[in-house]
Amino acid sequence: GCVGHRKSCEHDKKNGCCYFMTCNCWHPMGQ
C-alpha cells in the first residue's frame, strides 16, 4: 500500500513509485 510522503521524489522515481505532486511510494507487492 501507500507508505506516506517523501521529502524527495528522486529515490522513489528510480523505484518507479513517485506520484505527481505528492511523493507517495507505492509498493505493489505489499501493504
From Swiss-Prot:
Swiss-Prot/TrEMBL keywords: Calcium channel impairing toxin, Disulfide bond, Ion channel impairing toxin, Knottin, Neurotoxin, Secreted, Toxin, Voltage-gated calcium channel impairing toxin
Query: Where is it mostly found?
Result: secreted
DNA damage: present as a keyword of the record?
A: no
Q: Disulfide connectivity?
A: C2-C18, C9-C23
Which cell locations does it reside in? Answer: Secreted
Where in the body, by tissue, does this protein show up?
A: Expressed by the venom gland.
User: Per UniProt, what is one GO molecular function of this protein?
Assistant: toxin activity
- List cellular component terms (GO): extracellular region
Print the domain comment field: The presence of a 'disulfide through disulfide knot' structurally defines this protein as a knottin.
Task: Give the protein family.
Answer: Belongs to the neurotoxin 02 (plectoxin) family. 09 subfamily.
Q: Briefly, what is this protein's role?
A: Antagonist of L-type calcium channels (Cav1/CACNA1).
- Its protein name is U6-ctenitoxin-Co1a
Organism in which the protein naturally occurs: Ctenus ornatus
